[in-house]
Amino acid sequence: MNVQPCSRCGYGVYPAEKISCIDQIWHKACFHCEVCKMMLSVNNFVSHQKKPYCHAHNPKNNTFTSVYHTPLNLNVRTFPEAISGIHDQEDGEQCKSVFHWDMKSKDKEGAPNRQPLANERAYWTGYGEGNAWCPGALPDPEIVRMVEARKSLGEEYTEDYEQPRGKGSFPAMITPAYQRAKKANQLASQVEYKRGHDERISRFSTVVDTPELLRSKAGAQLQSDVRYTEDYEQQRGKGSFPAMITPAYQIAKRANELASDVRYHQQYQKEMRGMAGPAIGAEGILTRECADQYGQGYPEEYEEHRGKGSFPAMITPAYQNAKKAHELASDIKYRQDFNKMKGAAHYHSLPAQDNLVLKQAQSVNKLVSEVEYKKDLESSRGHSINYCETPQFRNVSKISKFTSDNKYKENYQNHMRGRYEGVGMDRRTLHAMKVGSLASNVAYKADYKHDIVDYNYPATLTPSYQTAMKLVPLKDANYRQSIDKLKYSSVTDTPQIVQAKINAQQLSHVNYRADYEKNKLNYTLPQDVPQLVKAKTNAKLFSEVKYKEGWEKTKGKGFEMKLDAMSLLAAKASGELASNIKYKEEYEKTKGKAMGTADSRLLHSLQIAKMSSEVEYKKGFEESKTRFHLPMDMVNIRHAKKAQTLASDLDYRKKLHEYTVLPEDMKTQWAKKAYGLQSELQYKADLAWMKGVGWLTEGSLNLEQAKKAGQLVSEKNYRQRVDELKFTSVTDSSQMEHAKKSQELQSGVAYKAGNEQSVHQYTISKDEPLFLQARANAANLSEKLYKSSWENQKAKGFELRLDSLTFLAAKAKRDLASEVKYKEDYERSRGKLIGAKDVQGDSQMSHSLQMSKLQSELEYKKGFEDTKSQCHVSLDMVHLVHARKAQHLATDVGYKTAEHHFTALPTDMKVEWAKKAYGLQSDNQYRADVKWMKGMGWVATGSLNVEQAKKAGELISEKKYRQHPDALKFTSIKDTPEMVQARISYTQAVDRLYREQGENIKHHYTPTADLPEVLLAKLNAMNISETRYKESWSKLRDGGYKLRLDALPFQAAKASGEIISDYKYKEAFEKMKGQMLGSRSLEDDISLAHSVYATSLQSDVNYKKGFEHSKAQFHLPLDMAALVHAKKAQTLASNQDYKHPLPQYTSLAEDLRLSCAKKAHKLQSENLYRSDLNFMRGVACVIPGTLEIEGRKKASELISESKYRQHPHSFKYTAVTDTPNLLHAKFSNQITNERLYKAAGEDARHEYTMTLGLPEFIRAKTNAANLSDARYKESWRNLRAQGYKLTIEALPFQAARASGDIASDFLYRHDFVKERGKLIGPQSVRDDPRIQHCRRMGQLQSELQYRRGATSSQAQFHLPMDMVHLVHAKNAQALASDHDYRTQYHKFTALPEDLKMAWAKKAHALQSELRYKSDLIGMKGIGWLALRSPQMESAKKAGELISETKYRKKPDSIKFTTVVDSPDLVHAKNSYMHCNERMYRSGDAESLHRYTLIPDHPDFTRARLNALHLSDKVYRNSWEQTRAGSYDFRLDAIPFQTARASREIASDFRYKEAFLRDRGLQIGYRSVDDDPRMKHFLNVGRLQSDNEYKKDFAKSRSQFHSSTDQPGLLQAKRSQQLASDVHYRQPLPQPTCDPEQLGLRHAQKAHQLQSDVKYKSDLNLTRGVGWTPPGSYKVEMARRAAELANARGLGLQGAYRGAEAVEAGDHQSGEVNPDATEILHVKKKKALLL
């Protein structure tokens, strides 16, 4: 059925609602008046320009009487005068010869379409911004009233008002062109387009839009070629001529102003209301408006330029008008005026009478109000007026002269046209003139019929065609098509693709070598070019033959190696150290000596083992098991204990009771040290505060300041022992660099060797900078000048007493370092270690005894026996004391201030030693000792004395001797031959330098034409050539081919289209729908009958029924059921039936599933598939890649069911081999290929002739001399012949002797045996408070002791049994409490330095999967790095360094072998010889006068810069200038305040002071009743009290019912709570805690610090930060930039150094250290910047 679209709405019109009028098809509902929207019929419509109107609104009947002073008439008059009047036409016609501008440009055509969208967007933007600052004050009653009035009027009224409003003499509002443009704007509007879309979707689409469908639609719009090119075409032709001043823009803007309701009423209110007068008034108003609009100076300037032919476009009326329109449309200008006008009304709510805005809104409402409108109508209804005499009629007649198109054209034809139309004008000029006259949109559309005859105006540009084209996508066929039909089109001219093409051309090796290929045959390379000579020399250096030749010569000379050489002895010693056999041998020797004394601790361990022994336990059990009076609740407690130990994590972590180790054992201390070094937690603890802090460049000012501040406030550094402070010499500090440089300058050998030859051959000018610098250096290094200044200083005199600080400090340091002094003090103070006559004299022991008595059950029972007969005892005192003690044990404060628990003698050696250690650790005292050295001279590093002193210090260092081998860290020395060679290799491997060198060489080099590389390059050029590629394609394309409609690709595409088509699918589905169940009843359907029968067979009820019937009959073959079951099982398990399931039941032939299965089997059938190919047998071979083959491949891929159905994860990534990246990688591989490089070197090696006098040749000779073994031994003999004096008292001998004693195992054991008896201080077990305490605790915890006490007291009825429950509750609380979990050392007595304890902590930290992976969370989503890149190599190296596997491997598995003749070492030696300054200068002296260096040579320039950088004079001058700048450092400066505050924080005195203040706040109650905790404990004690329980039991035992709170149930509940993981993890709500308690605050703070959520909350701001797809344009650009930066030697440090220097300069001066807050602010800023 042919359904035609409606002329108004565009939808299809069916016969029932069809009207055919005005040569068009309409819906009945759409056939309405254009003005009032009244429904029309065939009989009552009036046609005007093919649009229907009612009789009342017929545009032809101009019967409406217009009021003369309406704003519309004034606008009508102003509009033709200002924009399209006669004067402007004259100006335009005069300017036509000067300016030629095509009015049909893309800008003009696009402007009307864009204008409504742009206005709408700008309007809503302005509305949103204006909304933002409106105050939220209370609404005024007037405002509320007006809002309601506006709502009642509504938008429909204003729409109806808009259309009849313009029914005056100006027909712009009702012209067909205006209505058509308005309709086109509505159609083009995205809002109008989308309105009703959801309803239409629900009506016409069966499937709701899924997210995938919506996403694909959005993607299709993004990928749409039409959308993309449409925007691009609109913007493509724009140059520097702004769209704001085009006539189309002016017309559209003016039309918007005319159509604007607000503008209409504003203009009317401001100018016209209340005025009445003749036409002169209108003229005056017009003149005034023109004067206001264009200014006074415009006519004068216009008259000046009027007669001139060419005048600037800046003063044309069109330009002025456009400028004014631009200002009106400009958002910036609008906001400027708006901000000026913004007054109090915007920020305060005035009453309605005072608010000007409200007054204006009220007046507008009155105008819009229908009541006001009808009032005037009622008042004027009864008057009769002669229309011809009214001023309005005269005004209209006057206006009609100006608005008449005939009059306008008459003036134009009479006055203007004859000036320009003549013989000399060609058609282009006439066309330009005609285009200029079409500036008015109204005149343009009125004159459209004339233009279409004269000029070729294409139909595709008409509004109706554009509208129809916009409606094409809305058609049902296009709208309902499947997504799969939309094909992806690659837009070839997108900026990204264009940029990629440019990049590919830039990266193209062919383009790169194109110029070279043209010019390479035009150069002749001389034989003596330095580069050529250097290449030959390099070829010799890299020659394998030469290399082996030198090695053979060296090998044949031999060398002398004695058995007592230092290297052999060191190797033996290291081998013994690393030897597993030696290690085990020493271990076996010392194994029996570890427990060589009757140690009281061992006895204690044996005693504890007996107590915990099962045998001992059973002995006691055998004795007591026959007694009936055992309290039954003991079993429950025992069970609860066992359950708690099983469920508790604490016992899992406390494995330390298994054995006892001596704390002074050497192995224990050594293990402690090793574990401290290995501790991952301690290592990472220093870095915890840096979590989340941004990345900073190493070495920057802020980073160094932050490091220093971190060291100052570090608790670890403050508390650490003296021997852990390491002295590290900063190798790259200015002092060290200066010292190195001075050493080189002072070296007489190097100085004379380099200058000896040039002294007599060179004349230097006196004012040469180097000469002046040498003089200055000589003055600086002059011994005489140095001593003269010293003598001058000495003459002034100074006083140095024997009691000065420096002497005293030196003495003190000597005494500290002296072993004799140390042992002397130790011997003196050895007897003072205990310092108490008896236990009562020692406060600590007394306190321990008192604690043991308090905790002792026996003591408690003794006291109870004394007081049990007294009724008035206050039991809460015991609880109070116990609670205090428990609080002390549980609180963290008491843990940290442990030194308050005992009183130490002031003469105690430990106290003195601690004071001395703290004094040494004090940073202030440490720096005070160094202050006197400021300004002192320096010692040249590398001199003999310094090296001897260093070596001696290392040999006698106890710390270095005792440290673990794994603690030795690798330090890279920057100026080693390896590092220098690495730098040289890096510069050689840099692509940029390589290409620069290649560019230099390639113009002097003539390669042979048949080289393999050249042939390969040509082949590659042919392969990569786009021209060759397109040429072959063009040839193939020109050959032509025949493709019929019945060809395979077409048929396959049709079939695939039908398969994919949703419509076809549904059509087939509808056809087959009635055939699915083709039976009249269930019995007729074989499938259903089979299912019912199978169900009945499987039914247990039916089975049993049949069994009941047949069980009495003997002849039933019982094996039938099993047989059927086996068959069924076989069919289920059989693979054959699985593949061919159809024959098992009978199906209808027209069943949909059956036909689908047949189709599937046909597709899967191998025989059918191959039978199709039988007709092709004997057909000739088809070349792969032809059009037919590719077409068939594509068709088979399209119809492939497996590919269509496959999972997205099965798609594999395929690399395109001809991408620029892969081509670049291939070429880079060829360039960096060592084999090809050497092959090219071998070919080129025999074609060079070396000149003998070249500097490189001379340097090679010098290098050969330097590498010569004969020369080396000769110089050694000469040096040895000079001799030197080395006495026995020399420092090295003394150091060696001392180190021999230290390293001696015999002396070590001798000292150990001497000291062995001094390890345990007390004479017996009773003198050792620790062991006494352990014994006491063992007795308390002993089951035997407990049972003895129970036996002695079980017959007494008055014993309060609730104490057992209270102890149990305390223990359970302690186990469940997280507090006690963290401070678990109070529950048992364990040696804190126990090896197992530290090892268990380490093992748990290592086993924690969460902690391990939490460090890696920050790395999620980070991209990959190319292999062999510097970052990847450094990461590998770091991984090897921190590798746990490599770290933990046995020492004997690490084999160190130095191959003396390895290429690396030989290469390093050669490189070192190359880098040697002395040899370089000595070898260069001969070639100095044979070579002329270009003054601006890069090497020369770089040498000058290096000389400037290394210049001591410049260095000192810059230092003097910096020092002269000075700075102000007051006592109230922020660094001082920060240091003071940090000192107070770290101060132990402040800490104790704060502790003493808070100590009284911990309990803070007058009695037990005020303390909620104690009340809680008492209540718990009463509830758990056995005494109370027995009282109640005695009352209720005669009653049969059992209470729910019986002890068994309570105990089970308690056990469940203890065993429950929930209560274990949430222990905090169980106790009642004082909120002001110090321990609670501390715990809260600790939990906040440990909170993973809070830690990760800092990272939430980075959530949602997008990722960049690999391979995209920006990623490739960034990667290329990184490669270029690496190639130029730029690191990240250089990139960020400037920004950090600026920020550092902003925050503080160069000499003031920042405080902590400033550091945090700077870090936050940098994190934001990064």
Swiss-Prot record:
The keyword Zinc applies. Residues 1596-1606 have a biased composition (Polar residues). GO terms for molecular function: actin binding; actin filament binding; metal ion binding; muscle alpha-actinin binding; vinculin binding. Residues 4-64 form the LIM zinc-binding domain. Residues 1595-1620 are annotated as: Disordered. Gene3D superfamilies: Cysteine Rich Protein. GO terms for biological process: cardiac muscle thin filament assembly. The modification Phosphoserine is found at S1081. Keywords: Actin-binding, LIM domain, Metal-binding, Phosphoprotein, Repeat, Zinc. GO terms for cellular component: fascia adherens; muscle tendon junction; Z disc. The keyword Phosphoprotein applies. Expressed in cardiac and skeletal muscle. SMART domains: LIM, NEBU. InterPro entries: NEBU/NEBL, Nebulin-like, Nebulin_repeat, Znf_LIM. Nebulin repeats lie at residues 63-97, 156-166, 175-202, 203-237, 246-273, 298-307, 316-343, 348-382, 389-417, 419-453, 487-521, 522-556, 558-592, 602-626, 627-661, 662-692, 702-724, 726-760, 761-795, 797-831, 844-869, 870-896, 901-935, 945-963, 969-1003, 1004-1038, 1040-1074, 1078-1112, 1113-1139, 1144-1178, 1183-1206, 1212-1246, 1247-1281, 1283-1317, 1321-1355, 1356-1390, 1391-1421, 1429-1449, 1455-1481, 1490-1524, 1526-1560, 1564-1598, 1599-1626, 1640-1664. It holds the Pfam family LIM. Interacts with actin, alpha-actinin, KLHL41, TLN1 and VCL. Interacts with CSRP3. May be involved in anchoring the terminal actin filaments in the myofibril to the membrane and in transmitting tension from the myofibrils to the extracellular matrix. This is Nebulin-related-anchoring protein. It comes from Homo sapiens. The gene is NRAP.
